[in-house]
């Protein structure tokens, strides 16, 4: 790898994440020459499997599917996999090619995968399909990741580099906690779920121009301009961690109301208001996704190296990589048809007209995913080493107009407002109008990370400990009785059963930690790395799922490698705690074997 490519991939944040994930040693690259062109080719192949370790929590399964949850929009994955069953059996590969001529080069990375469990096995509850899905969310596929050209140069003995093409740019000092300064590239969530996942598999490169130039021997300026917008890849519906309604192509999972209304569906169709009713209820159709535009995403950074500390200042204007959910109320033609069909329904089955009217308003409405544009981010960071040898980093980020998701139950109930006199939901609604799924708020986040190496601990050559804590403040939140943000729909609407908690709070915080022991040459040249990870959301509920009070997770594992070529990894992850934790029944074991060459 050249100096430029190392900058592109192993920035301080990526290095910290590599330590945090227990990244294995680098592969033995194949080096070659074509005349004066120097080339390297890296390859990694692996097989792996993951097993679910808990039965589905009935409180997280909708009532229509035999549970006690107030929504069925997130239970397909729970009902598709039983305790002890594999939810992934995968073969995958990733390859890096770099060609360099002097100070100029090309870097290309590609990956492919085939999940035998998801692709070839029958599912107990609902089939898993690749139709209409993003490539990264499919059960099998292949992708070109990075593909950029670069050039290194010097101006007055001050180094500079430029890159153009699909690439990853990492800023800030965050290691574990999201919503940080490091928000330039979207994430492939599906890739990170796969056993044996590497960091480079889950970061989505985007076409952009990037430049870095030294102004003095201590001051550097960087900047980027993205040539396209891309979105985060979400888990496919029906998979172990998937949500039924969010991924591309998952269009029929937003079900509400009662399936008992099905016999009256032909009556609605006769009045020109057809609706789809399944065993899970009335389907709210999915409207077209409202993707962000390609233009308008850029940022600049200044880095200053003091005697013992590096400081950074950042500004970005970017479009959201993760979607918000909104709804669109049925139009005037639907309202005009209601009196006639309600009268006939009551004649056929006294008292059924009200249920039919609600079902028609729900089934003739829509939901849509929207990616808000022009989010501004201001940030500052530092990185230093304490006298104890502990690496200490930190950052603060401020978004004056960050989108925060409105409670989705209120958005669904807003579809009923035209026939409920506005009493169904606090959202103001008119026929045919959008119920925007977010509001812009001031969001400030402060976080700090400590990393320390302890030599000769418990017989290991080294113990690495990384800890990170963050606090988030959301400004301008309305009174909860007027408008709510966040909380999964499975917990019901505001006030259901007297429950008014679990919504986004003005302040929230939590911390993450990871410890790794390094045992070299334990048996016949095999190196072992036992590791322990811990996550705790201490207080409050963060915007867009960032923190969830009381939620905890612990992961225990061991990584092994032989001659930096053959690898193995085994881990157990347990989710627990918190009154609104939808991961409580998603405990799993992951096992993988790999070879690097």
Question: What function would you assign to each model-found segment?
Answer:
Residues 28-41, 54-56, 97-106, 150-163, ...:
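Short loop/turn motifs that connect adjacent beta-strands in outer-membrane beta-barrel proteins
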Residues 40, 92-96, 146-148, 208, ...:
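Membrane-embedded beta-strand positions in outer-membrane beta-barrel channels/transporters
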Residues 585-597:
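Outer-membrane beta-barrel "beta-signal"
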Residues 86-88, 316-318, 323, 393, ...:
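Detector for outer-membrane/organellar transmembrane beta-barrel domains
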Residues 85-89, 136-141, 198-203, 290-294, ...:
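Short sequence motifs at beta-strands and strand-loop junctions characteristic
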Residues 100-251, 510, 539, 547-552, ...:
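Outer membrane beta-barrel
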Residues 57-78, 119-135, 185-194, 237-286, ...:
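Solvent-exposed loop segments that connect transmembrane elements
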Residues 47-53, 103, 112-116, 166-170, ...:
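Transmembrane beta-strands of outer-membrane beta-barrel pores
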């Amino acid at each position: 790898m050249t100096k430029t490519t190392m900058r592109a991939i192993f920035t301080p944040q990526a290095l910290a994440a590599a330590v945090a994930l227990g990244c294995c040693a680098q592969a033995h690259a194949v080096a070659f020459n074509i005349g004066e062109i120097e080339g390297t080719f890296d390859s990694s192949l692996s097989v792996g499997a993951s097993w679910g370790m808990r039965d589905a929590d009935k409180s997280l399964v909708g009532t229509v599917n035999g549970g006690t949850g107030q929504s069925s929009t997130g239970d397909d994955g729970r009902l598709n996999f039983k305790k002890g069953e594999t939810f992934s059996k995968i073969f995958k590969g990733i390859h890096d090619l770099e060609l360099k001529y002097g100070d100029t080069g090309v870097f290309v990375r590609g990956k492919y995968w085939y999940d035998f469990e998801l692709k070839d096995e029958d599912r107990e509850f609902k089939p898993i399909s690749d139709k209409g899905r993003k490539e990264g969310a499919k059960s099998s596929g292949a992708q070109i990741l990075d593909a950029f050209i670069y050039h290194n140069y010097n101006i007055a003995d001050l180094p500079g580099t430029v890159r153009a093409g699909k690439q990853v740019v990492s800023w800030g000092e965050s290691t574990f906690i999201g919503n940080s300064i490091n928000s330039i590239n979207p994430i492939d969530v599906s890739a990170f779920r796969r056993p044996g996942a590497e960091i480079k598999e889950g970061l989505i490169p985007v076409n952009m121009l990037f430049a870095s130039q030294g102004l003095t021997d201590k001051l550097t300026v960087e900047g980027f301009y993205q040539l396209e917008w891309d979105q985060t890849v979400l888990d496919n519906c029906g998979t172990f961690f998937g949500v039924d309604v969010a991924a591309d192509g998952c269009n029929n999972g937003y079900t509400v109301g009662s399936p008992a209304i099905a016999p009256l569906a032909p009556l609605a169709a006769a009045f020109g208001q057809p609706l789809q009713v399944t065993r899970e209820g009335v389907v709210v159709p999915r409207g077209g996704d409202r993707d962000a535009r390609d233009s308008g995403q850029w940022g600049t950074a200044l880095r200053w190296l003091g005697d013992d500390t590096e400081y950074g200042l950042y500004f970005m204007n970017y479009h959201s990589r993760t979607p918000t959910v909104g709804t669109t109320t049925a139009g005037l033609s639907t309202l005009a048809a209601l009196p006639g069909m309600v009268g006939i329904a009551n004649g056929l089955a006294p008292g059924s007209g009200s249920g039919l009217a609600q079902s028609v308003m729900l089934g003739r409405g829509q939901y849509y995913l929207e990616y808000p544009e022009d989010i501004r981010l201001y940030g500052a960071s530092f990185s230093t080493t304490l006298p104890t040898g502990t690496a200490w980093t930190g950052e603060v980020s401020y978004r004056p107009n960050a989108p925060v998701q409105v409670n989705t139950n209120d958005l669904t109930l807003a579809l009923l407002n035209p026939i409920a006199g506005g009493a169904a939901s606090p959202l103001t609604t008119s026929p045919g109008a959008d119920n925007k799924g977010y509001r812009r708020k001031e969001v400030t986040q402060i976080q700090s990370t400590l990393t320390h190496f302890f030599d000769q601990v418990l017989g290991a050559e080294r113990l690495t400990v990384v800890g990170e804590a963050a606090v988030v403040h959301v400004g301008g939140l309305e009174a909860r009785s007027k408008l709510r943000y966040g909380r999964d729909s499975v917990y019901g609407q505001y006030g259901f059963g007297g429950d008014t908690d679990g919504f986004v709070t003005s302040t929230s915080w939590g911390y993450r930690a990871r410890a790794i022991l390094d045992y070299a040459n334990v048996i016949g040249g095999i190196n072992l790395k036992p590791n322990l990870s811990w996550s705790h959301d201490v207080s409050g509920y963060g915007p867009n799922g960032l923190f969830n009070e009381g939620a905890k997770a612990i992961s225990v594992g061991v990584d092994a490698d032989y001659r930096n070529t053959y690898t193995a990894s085994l881990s157990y992850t347990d989710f627990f705690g918190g009154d609104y934790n939808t991961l409580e029944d998603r405990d799993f074991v992951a096992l993988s074997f790999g070879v690097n060459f």
